[in-house]
C-alpha cells in the first residue's frame, strides 16, 4: 500500500512539474517529469503530452509483490460544454 501511494505522489508531482515546464517545449517538460520522478525514487517514468495535457506514468518496485503503477494528468481544467 505504501508503494502505491508513493507511486501516485510521484506521478502527481512529476506531471505538475512537467506542465509548468511545457511552455519551454515537450522535451523540457518530460525531462522535468523524469527528474522529479527519479528524485522520488521511482524506477521507471514515462511522460507524454496530449494536446495541452501532460500524462506521467510511473512504476515503483514492491518488495516480494512486483510493481506499483500510477498515472497522473496535469493541464488545463476540462470545462464541460452545455448545449445552448
UniProtKB/Swiss-Prot annotation:
Induction: Component of the Rv3654c-Rv3660c operon that is highly up-regulated during M.tuberculosis infection of macrophages.
Highest taxon, organism lineage: Bacteria
Subcellular location: Secreted; Host cytoplasm
N-terminal signal peptide: 1-39
Keyword field: Host cytoplasm, Secreted, Signal, Virulence
Record flagged with keyword Secreted: yes
Disulfide bonds: none
GO cellular component, one term: host cell cytoplasm
Main location: secreted
InterPro entries membership: Rv3654c-like
GO biological process: symbiont-mediated suppression of host apoptosis
Described function: Effector protein that participates in the suppression of macrophage apoptosis by blocking the extrinsic pathway. Recognizes the host polypyrimidine tract binding protein-associated splicing factor (PSF), which probably leads to its cleavage, diminishing the level of caspase-8 in macrophages.
Subunit structure: Interacts with human polypyrimidine tract binding protein-associated splicing factor (PSF).
Official protein name in the record: Apoptosis inhibitor Rv3654c
Species the sequence originates in: Mycobacterium tuberculosis (strain ATCC 25618 / H37Rv)
